């Protein structure tokens, strides 16, 4: 444990070195969380754009594979799953708030393929966009 390690240090310098290492590890963990938070912020802000993990990782100066692993570890979801959840959440709001066509809603939330939009919507909501809209009417 940390207490035993501190007690076992022989000199004040050893103690300082140990504490510096612990703080460094702690800050490294915080930076990882900060990177994931930045990704979540980008998804929340720009979900309707053509987003990719590769592009975001370039902005953050971090390896895309590593960033994908961090996202999975921190959120228990992949980048694509998080993006789809955000887009579908926005689509649900548009479907209920506006009378836009389902195709228009699809494009408004960032999908370029209506068939794929239907597939993802059904997977996450358990029903088609049309059925989702009708349930409230």
Protein language model regions, located:
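Residues within the alpha-helical elements of helix-turn-helix
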Residues: 59, 108-109, 124
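Short, Lys/Arg-enriched, Trp-marked, Pro/Gly-tolerant hinge/linker segments that flank
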Residues: 1-38, 60, 73-81, 85
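Short helix/strand-capping hinge loops at secondary-structure junctions
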Residues: 46-51, 78-79, 128-129
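Residues within helix-turn-helix
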Residues: 54, 65, 101-104, 114-115, ...
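…primarily DNA-binding HTH/wHTH and HhH modules…
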Residues: 119-137
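Terminal helix-turn-helix DNA-binding modules in bacterial transcription factors
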Residues: 41, 45, 73-112, 134-137
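Short hydrophobic/aromatic patch on the recognition helix
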Residues: 67, 71, 116-117, 121
